[in-house]
């Protein structure tokens, strides 16, 4: 069977840049599924994406499905015919479904009986006939949160569609996709190359688009070119470009023919905190800032034009004129804000609502101030500095700079605090209170900052759970999942001596009578333990290891982490599987018994050598391991407990627990309970698979 290259290009108006990659990848994934479901042999499915097009190119696509033999078994003969030999309704219905009459059916005989059988040779459909529906289905399944409708048609897509190119080899596949009749026409760059041209063969793509249309269709190629050219441009002016992955992706999604240029701004603007300038350049203008080797911002920026100009200086000057007013605004706001102290913004916090039932930002500030001081006392941080940081924590939200450039919250608080002469760890805490902002983000760097960051997040968790507005499904408007994971990361990775129970209780207490959820403390802790589950799964821990630790509900995050590492190590020991099974057996035996057990094992009642040996080792280990448990040395404790494998195995091989002698039975049950309690001091290893 011959093979050909298939090309589908959907020509659109400008697609959302932040969604371009996901749209293209999903298109390719969806179409691959369609090909496989149809049984069409194919080679690589390659995707291309540019601002005004989504394209797939499929190599070595079979021209038709393979022929196949099908068999459909019908009713058993006993049910297929009545006593007179006439076909039953079941047999007739089955035959209609197969497109035959009952008398045309074959018979299938096995050692289990005889059935009606339909056999047929099905000729594979041509690829040409299948492709239109496969393309339409793949497009319909794209992850588009908001569809558009254009013109008078009822067609919906992410953006209006102007061209649809469907080529199998050199042949146009006739179809109407998204309201457009397929053709071999492709549109080029808006301002360079040929605005529109025809493509003779699918194999010509994407080279023909580059040569005639001045469009680089390959997304990764454009991105790599921007990165390489920007690095070279920065090197020429003695700096390093800030090429963040997210901005690189966005810029690559905005241009069809990237041309990297370098521009500058007045050095006087460098007196403004670099973060504000960078926010303007990256967030508003999609420029790449440039830093000197010492990390200081240079008065230059790199940008990407979407056209090759005969006079690039004109484009450079235009971009410099665009950014200058924004930088001047930042300079004005910075100078204006510094005319008063950061603390002077406190009264204005009373005018901004945090949440209707939970009060204003000033109310939140007062709670954070108190909670940060309490946390500082627990972890050995400077209490005065922590409470001061709490008091100032939201003041920068009332400044002109943060009002205009919202992403500078925190960092501007730090700069204004330094200007006011606040302690350095207080100033740093104002900047780091929102960390970690995302997975893998840096944690607060000093104890005061840790106290403030935890206080801010715990206040939000306690308040929102306290009024019953916990996250539901994918909806998490107050970012509580991120807040909970942030608290856990800070406590675990900084090894802070904090207990979620007392921490949550203190956060709840500071709300007074504002909260309506009587179970708020337990709800917050359960939610945070659930975040632990997600965190450790992402770290590669098995679900049963996590369950074993969660069963003990440890509320000290650092302690939880130590238990996780201990159980994970325990699983590598030779004795682990046997002891996990033994614990499960012990758990089941104890669960089935409703008898009241003694506080201690009566050694004089023991009879069998195996139970005597096990009882002695349990007593010895109980005393030996007490310091281990007190110090959180759970891994060492489980290594010691692994030595119980042989006596435990011997006990269950030789000793009957549920004997008729009540005293003996209760004594043996008590011994098993004491054995299980030793393991439960770390985790419920009976849950290990």
From Swiss-Prot:
GO terms for cellular component: cytosol. PROSITE patterns: AA_TRNA_LIGASE_II_GLYAB. One of its GO terms (molecular function) is arginine-tRNA ligase activity. InterPro entries: DALR_anticod-bd (IPR008909), Gly-tRNA-synth_bsu (IPR015944), Gly-tRNA-synth_heterodimer (IPR006194). It catalyses: tRNA(Gly) + glycine + ATP = glycyl-tRNA(Gly) + AMP + diphosphate. This is Glycine--tRNA ligase beta subunit. NCBIfam families: glyS (TIGR00211). Belongs to the class-II aminoacyl-tRNA synthetase family. It is an enzyme of class 6 (ligase). Coiled coil: none annotated. The gene is glyS. It comes from the Bacteria. Its main location: cytoplasm. It is found in: Cytoplasm. Its EC number is 6.1.1.14. Keywords: Aminoacyl-tRNA synthetase, ATP-binding, Cytoplasm, Ligase, Nucleotide-binding, Protein biosynthesis. SUPFAM superfamilies: HD-domain/PDEase-like. GO terms for biological process: arginyl-tRNA aminoacylation; glycyl-tRNA aminoacylation. It comes from Shigella boydii serotype 18 (strain CDC 3083-94 / BS512). Tetramer of two alpha and two beta subunits.
